[in-house]
């Protein structure tokens, strides 16, 4: 962010959004502008965009063919909003409003705590695809990786794990089934 001329402030003073935009420049620019407007309407300051450096040559043909344009957006925490959950709630609202207004952009994550790196590739390709994950300057307290092949849907960039808040192996439906009241309990 320093190289881009952005003053993001201290820890948890900013939110980072990871976006999968359309490759088409006009549609991408329209979606970016829409997000900027929504952030401002939600009382926050939009700081700028960053192209996420990637190495598509490590991916398979199909993944490259449908690869989105990957960018990060930076949002400054308002002075009147506390760090942590209050700020993340504001970011959540901005994300949801944006998702309702944009059909062809996927918000991978938007948070002051986490940045989700994901895609349509194997676990071993994660680090080689995203240049950020190879950088000595990049630090993280925790990293979670999840790998699973799609069993009942076609693979896509947005369906790849991890999701914004958790990693799972598809057993959620089973758990829900076991916790639902039985018809015999009625």
Task: Report each predicted region and the residues it spans.
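Extended, highly charged
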Residues: 3-141, 145-147, 151, 186
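Acidic loop->beta-strand submotif enriched in PP2C/PPM serine/threonine phosphatases
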Residues: 154-164
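Conserved small/polar residues in nucleotide/adenosyl-binding loops
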Residues: 178-185
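Conserved phosphate/anionic-ligand binding catalytic regions in large, soluble enzymes, centered on
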Residues: 1-2, 164-177
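A short secondary-structure junction signal
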Residues: 129, 155-157, 177
């Amino acid at each position: 962010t320093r190289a881009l001329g952005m003053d993001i402030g201290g820890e948890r003073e900013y939110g980072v959004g990871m976006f999968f935009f359309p490759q088409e420049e006009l549609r991408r620019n329209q979606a970016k502008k829409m997000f900027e407007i929504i952030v401002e309407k939600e009382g926050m300051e939009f700081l700028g965009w960053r192209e996420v450096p990637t190495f598509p040559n490590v991916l398979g043909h199909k993944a490259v063919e449908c690869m989105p344009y990957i960018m990060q957006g930076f949002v400054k925490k308002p002075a009147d909003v506390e760090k942590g959950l209050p700020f993340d709630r504001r970011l959540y609202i901005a994300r949801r409003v944006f998702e309702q207004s944009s059909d062809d952009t996927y918000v991978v994550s938007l948070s002051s705590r986490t940045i989700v790196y994901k895609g349509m590739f194997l676990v071993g390709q994660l680090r080689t695809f995203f240049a950020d994950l190879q950088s000595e300057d990049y630090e993280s307290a925790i990293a979670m990786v999840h790998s699973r092949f799609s069993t009942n849907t076609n693979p896509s960039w947005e369906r790849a794990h991890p999701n914004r808040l958790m990693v799972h192996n598809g057993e959620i439906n089973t758990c829900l089934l076991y916790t639902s009241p039985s018809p015999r309990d009625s």
